[in-house]
Amino acid sequence: MKRCSTAPSAMPAGRSVVFIDRPDWHSRQLGAALVKSGIQPVFLSFRNCGFAGGAGGSRLHLPSFQEELPLGAFVRSIAAGSFEQVTLRLGILHALRELGVPVYNDARVIERCVDKSTTSFLLHRAGLPTPPTWTLESEAAARAVVRAEASAARPLVLKPLFGSQGRGLALIENEAALPPPDAVSGVYYLQHFVSEGSGRWRDWRVFVVGGRAIAAMLRHGVSWKTNAAQGAACEAFEPDGQMRALAEAAAEAVGAGFAGVDIIRDASGRLLVLEVNSNPAWSALQRVTRTRISEVLVADFLSRIAEAPATRACNAATRAGG
């Protein structure tokens, strides 16, 4: 069978889309890094994108890209919305990938990470240490889990299935603390509460880009919620080989080009992966590291764009029987 090369070609000049709901520090950082690399960024909100009908059926509609596709699509953020809105936004990303546009991170990765139950499953399947977790629709089943764990003095954390930055978390130490189904959108995501003990509320955020841990920070929480958005103090941290390898393996388990991996240590000293974020913010991390995170992200993003023309040509030749 004839094989064709997928070696990276020279970076073409052109424009790339950056999906972001509103301009912020991250968009300025990404924009500067893209311009420095010779790429013109076009910032779009998903609210202004969609699919447009015509004589040929339905086609992808991206403002400013009526005549050509973007070289690539960097997904900085997907704003909260209804189930239908989020489905449409992910559909746009799926369509871009089907059209051969490199999407960073693509819809498949975002779907795996935004749904905490899928993340937990993939981490477990990859053999990575992660806290025991239950995802249930039945209130009776959730109450049975809480009773069993409470009887063994193992508190649980109730998390929104979709959510980030520590919002909506609740510590469940007994059955009375479990809210009704309508308060959790009909799904109970329950995870073992992990603590080092002695009132030490801390965890680590490791930033992985292109399969490599490039920066990390230690977060000291004012409570058991250790997110920077919840007031945690962040400081520079140099992860050892074990933590680096764990973070890199977690990003690989979900297929992420870049990811923020949250790691915690239990009372026995074992490291556990709590979550993998496919659209992580990095402003807090940038304040405590010398690594130019936006430039590293853009370099990895552009390497995927450079590979795309050869990959598309190879696929076309294969379909043609060449």
Go through each PLM region and give its residues.
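Rossmann-like NAD(P)H-binding beta-loop-alpha module
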Residues: P129-A153
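Extreme N-terminal starter segment of soluble prokaryotic enzymes
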Residues: P12-V17
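Conserved N-proximal alpha/beta basic substrate-recognition cap immediately N-terminal to
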Residues: D21-P132
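A long amphipathic alpha-helix within ATP-dependent nucleotide-binding catalytic cores
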Residues: W224-V273, S294-R312, R319-G321
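Protein kinase-like catalytic core scaffold
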Residues: L156, I214-A215, A259, L272-L274
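Phosphate-binding site of ATP-dependent enzymes
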Residues: Q165-A251
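Glycine-rich phosphate/pyrophosphate-binding beta-alpha loops
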Residues: N277-R290
